[in-house]
Design a protein with these regions (language model features):
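Single, function-defining residue in the core of a domain
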Residues: 2-47, 56-61, 120-121, 138, ...
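Short, positively charged, Gly/Tyr-enriched micro-motifs
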Residues: 35-101, 183, 227
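Active-site-proximal, Lys/Arg-enriched surface segment
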Residues: 52-58, 88-184, 296-301
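Short gly/ser-rich anion-binding loops that grip negatively charged ligand groups
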Residues: 60, 77, 165-169, 200-203
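Poly-acidic low-complexity segments
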Residues: 66, 97-105, 109, 235-238, ...
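Short coil/turn segments at secondary-structure boundaries
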Residues: 67-71, 103, 356-362
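Short, contiguous clusters of charged residues that form electrostatic/catalytic patches at enzyme active sites
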Residues: 68, 174-177, 208-212
Length: 449
């Protein structure tokens, strides 16, 4: 009898929490819904709100964003065609564009920048690029050749398996860029996404798209933020753009790219640091390998040929057999403490790697089967909005709700999983399980006949 009462109490609490989280969702997206309500029929706006919740409920990497699957969750299996038609009308409506949701993400980035302003801490805008692969598709609009990261990963040599790797594989797909706003600690905020192609009438290239975004960020946040770029941005053209826009940056330089030393010599990055001992050592946590590494740091003044202004090269050595980080920055370095700030700032770049992986694997960004580019970008923008909400649940003020959700709807025996500071995967699974068991009252009642 006691166990029955406990289960009944948990069930009542779960139904209440399902409504609470649904209300939090509405509060999160209310500003953008209000703007869309001025342009769209209220039924389409309601479909957008319902679709956001249904996307969280439908967890499947291959079919997560297939409209027929989403339609089945929206109105129930018996009315799946009607649910699919509702979503299709929303995505194909000519009265709104994906830019409305992308602008809303920019505003969330503005809020994050204002929230993170602190005299002793920097604010980071972390960039990274990726691709969305559609290897079996030929009919979708704006498909272009992209280098398959999946094929590259599968062709790595494994111990005991002797098939030699081949050259790079190129498949149909789209290019993709993502920006996060983050502080020295805590979760990052999704601020912007952009997709483009290299073929057709809308053909563009990476540097053109990235330059447009850099100019927009420079106008928006100026020198309040520090830009974090990986090796894909290394080179004189991009450094020149950063200097022209007067932005603060930390760029991981390639070891074989040349720099000019204070003596006027033109040397590769590794040659600039050759023979110089580290100035200091400390333990740095490796987010990727989940361990601490004894890391040494060295910094020296350098210049990039054809680029005006003094820059600094910070070298972080994390042990024998591991490639050092060569970090190029225009931040003034006067002591070792300033050099460590650069190293710790770049270590935050792992946040955007996790965000891209989460978008692809957990939110199924590569699964849509839409041909029209406008409809496709609208769906991606809606999913990005869902991702932004899930990240917002990591706020410290929501810790009791988050803890309850994980304990009751995604309990795990693994100690490492229980101690994860940002359990986004478990959080989405728990929320999906909760809403499937206790459907929010804001969603249409499913028809089972």
């Amino acid at each position: 009898m006691t166990q029955h009462r406990e289960k009944e109490a948990v069930g009542q609490g779960s139904a209440h929490q399902a409504e609470v989280i649904s209300q939090l969702w509405y509060v999160f997206v209310r500003p953008v819904l209000g703007r869309l309500h001025q342009e769209l029929d209220r039924r389409l706006v309601q479909t957008l709100l319902d679709l956001l919740q249904v996307i969280v409920m439908q967890r499947h990497r291959q079919h997560g964003l297939v409209l027929t699957e989403l339609g089945g969750h929206l109105l129930g299996p018996a009315q799946a065609p009607a649910g699919t038609k509702r979503i299709d009308r929303l995505l194909k409506s000519s009265h709104w564009q994906a830019a409305a949701l992308i602008d809303f993400l920019w505003e969330k980035g503005d809020e994050a920048v204002q929230r993170l302003i602190h005299p002793q801490d920097d604010i980071y805008v972390i960039w990274d690029e990726s691709v969305l692969e559609k290897p079996e598709s030929l009919k979708a609009e704006r498909l272009g050749p992209v280098r398959s990261s999946k094929a590259r990963r599968l062709l790595r040599i494994k111990p005991g398996f002797y098939t030699p790797p081949t050259g790079p594989a190129f498949v149909p797909g789209w290019n993709w860029l993502q920006l996060l706003v983050a502080g020295p600690r805590g979760p990052a905020t999704l601020a912007h996404l952009r997709w483009w192609t290299t073929r057709g009438q809308a053909a563009s290239d990476k540097r053109t798209e990235e330059t447009q975004i850099l100019q927009q960020v420079a106008r928006r946040w100026g020198r309040q933020v520090v830009h974090i770029w990986d090796q894909g941005f290394a080179g004189e053209p991009w450094v020149s753009q950063a200097v022209q826009q007067h932005v603060r940056f930390i760029l991981r330089w390639k070891k074989n790219y040349k720099l000019e030393t204070v003596t006027g010599q033109l040397l590769k990055a590794w040659e600039c640091a050759r023979g110089k001992r580290s100035m200091d050592h400390r333990l740095i946590y490796d987010s990727r390998r989940r361990c601490e590494r004894d890391t040494g740091v060295l910094y020296l003044p350098v210049r990039v040929p054809e680029v005006p202004g003094q820059l600094w090269l910070v070298v972080a050595r994390s042990g024998q057999g591991r490639t050092p980080w060569y970090l190029l920055t225009n931040e003034p370095l006067t002591d070792v403490a300033a050099a460590w700030r650069v190293v710790l700032a770049y270590s935050r770049r792992w946040q955007v790697e996790m965000s891209l992986r989460y978008s692809k694997s957990e939110l199924a960004f590569e699964s849509p089967r839409l041909r029209a580019w406008d409809a496709l970008t609208k769906l991606w923008a809606i999913v990005a909005l869902a991702q932004a909400f899930l990240v917002s649940l990591l706020d410290d003020g929501l810790e009791p709700l988050r803890t309850w959700l994980l304990q009751h709807w995604c309990a795990r025996a693994d100690k490492r999983l229980r101690k994860t500071k940002a359990p986004l995967y478990r959080l989405r699974l728990a929320l999906s399980s909760l809403w499937l068991a206790y459907r929010p009252s804001t969603l249409p009642r499913p028809c089972l006949d």
